Structure formats: structure tokens, C-alpha cells
């Protein structure tokens, strides 16, 4: 009896540790200064796809409140999914009165233009912090003719409906998992997968928020574990049934906000 109780206690502790999440909520960051431009056309069709791998931003739930980040902010793709609050600042000629703020999600990369000076065309050159906004959201804070405006910005918690979405692409020997709709910090810095016949295996970032594994996972129920930049972890146990197919999307547990 004592041995059975010990085994049950050990099992409970292991599952509790695996499912533990760092307490609290993501609190965001302090206000900082940057600049903003716009791209993608009046319907934001030119913002689809992008360096984060989200594809159609409408169907993924990001809409037009999105931005491409300069090198200094993009962080080699690690900032994909992060949310920011922006205000047009210190430019009364072009900023809308009342300095309304907007909330945007990082979905793309604004590449540097080293042939141009950073204050005249090379807006996204390092070390410059710059947001290239989808045109519809830019027009909420400034006039079209401005072209470029100074902004104040800060990281804020991402508020998303539903759970974290995991879309599994690839083939038998190459699994590419796109992670979207992440609440809290919004970005993902570490991801793992567990098959029903395997232990936990780390996924490596392929590009943007696409994470890869070369393990053979076909025919197994899958669990996913992800960690945001705030070090909170969410584990979704057996969320993918064993008969899953490539191209399908599955919903796991999201972070508290």
C-alpha cells in the first residue's frame, strides 16, 4: 500500500511540474521612441504573408492591425507575435488630434536599405527602431501625406480569442509547426512536442513562428509545450489525436492575460 501511494505521489508531482505555469500575467514594457511608416495599400493586401509565416492575416485573426519591424525590433524573428501600443508623437502637423493610440501585432520584417541613410529612406536600418505599419492602422494615428511620423511605443499584453493554434505542415520526416494566436507576451521563444510513444523533444525555430522537428510523429497523439519571452509556459496535453493529417490546425491552452 505504501509503495502504491509513493508511486501515485511521484506521478502527481511529475504531472504537476510539467503542467506548471509561471504565475501572474504579462505586464508589457515602458514607453520608448521610434518612427513609423506604412505599406501594403489601402486594403493591407500587401501585408499578407510576411517573415513571421502567418500567411493570410485575415484568416489568422490578425487583420490590419499589424506591423513589419526593423532589424532592431524584429530580433531574428523572435518578436513575431509580440503586441505593441503606438501613439503618434510630437508632430502636430501630421499627428491626429488627441494622440489616439493603436494596438498592433508584429507579423513581418522591415528589411534595411543600406543604400539610403537611416534618416532619409533607410528607415529600417539598424540600429533604428521602426514600425512599418499596415496602411489602414497608420491612418488611425496620422495623415496619409505624412509618410513618416515619430511615435511613442511600448510592449503590451496580447489579447486573443480562443487558444493557441498549432498548424502542422510538412511530411513524414519533416514536421513544420506554425504557432499562432498567442496571448500574453505573444511571442514564443521555446517550443517542444511529445508523441504518445516518445518523450518531450525540442522544436527548433525554422523561420518566424514556424518550428520544426525531423522526428516521425505520424500516427501518434501529440502534446505541445510553448514558452513566451516572459518565461511563462503553457502545456497542452494530447491535444492532437493520433489520426491527425498534415495541414490541420489544432487548438491548445492559451496564456492568461
Swiss-Prot record:
GO biological-process terms attached to the record: plant-type cell wall loosening; syncytium formation
Disulfide-bonded cysteines: 52-80, 83-158, 88-95
Keyword Zinc carried by entry: no
Topology of this chain in the membrane: Peripheral membrane protein
Primary localization: secreted
Entry GO CC: extracellular region; membrane; plant-type cell wall; plasmodesma
Keyword set includes Cell wall biogenesis/degradation: yes
Domain spans labelled Expansin-like EG45: 49-163
Boundaries of every Expansin-like CBD domain copy: 173-252
Entry's family note: Belongs to the expansin family. Expansin A subfamily.
Protein name: Expansin-A4
Organism in which the protein naturally occurs: Arabidopsis thaliana (Mouse-ear cress)
Lineage: Eukaryota, Viridiplantae, Streptophyta, Embryophyta, Tracheophyta
Amino acid at each position: 500500500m505504501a509503495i502504491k501511494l509513493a508511486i501515485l505521489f511521484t506521478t502527481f508531482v511529475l504531472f504537476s511540474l510539467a503542467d506548471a505555469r509561471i504565475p501572474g500575467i504579462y505586464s508589457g514594457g515602458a514607453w520608448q521612441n521610434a518612427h513609423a511608416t506604412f505599406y501594403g495599400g489601402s486594403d493591407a493586401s500587401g501585408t499578407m504573408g510576411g517573415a513571421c509565416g502567418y500567411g493570410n492575416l485575415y484568416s489568422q485573426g490578425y487583420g490590419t492591425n499589424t506591423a513589419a519591424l526593423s532589424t532592431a525590433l524584429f530580433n531574428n524573428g523572435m518578436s513575431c507575435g509580440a503586441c505593441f501600443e503606438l501613439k503618434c508623437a510630437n508632430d502636430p502637423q501630421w499627428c491626429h488630434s488627441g494622440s489616439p493610440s493603436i494596438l498592433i501585432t508584429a507579423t513581418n520584417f522591415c528589411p534595411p536599405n543600406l543604400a539610403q541613410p537611416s534618416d532619409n529612406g533607410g528607415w529600417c536600418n539598424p540600429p533604428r527602431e521602426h514600425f512599418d505599419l499596415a496602411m489602414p492602422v497608420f491612418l488611425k494615428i496620422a495623415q496619409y501625406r505624412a509618410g513618416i511620423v515619430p511615435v511613442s511605443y511600448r510592449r503590451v499584453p496580447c489579447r486573443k480569442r480562443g487558444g493557441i493554434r498549432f498548424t502542422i505542415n510538412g511530411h513524414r520526416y519533416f514536421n513544420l509547426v506554425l504557432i499562432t494566436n498567442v496571448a500574453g507576451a505573444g511571442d514564443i521563444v521555446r517550443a517542444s512536442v511529445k508523441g504518445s510513444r516518445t518523450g518531450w523533444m525540442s522544436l527548433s525555430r525554422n523561420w518566424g513562428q514556424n518550428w520544426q522537428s525531423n522526428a516521425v510523429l505520424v500516427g501518434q497523439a501529440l502534446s505541445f509545450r510553448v514558452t513566451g519571452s516572459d518565461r511563462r509556459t503553457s502545456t497542452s496535453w494530447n491535444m492532437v489525436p493520433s489520426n491527425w493529417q498534415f495541414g490541420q490546425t489544432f487548438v491548445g491552452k492559451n496564456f492568461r492575460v
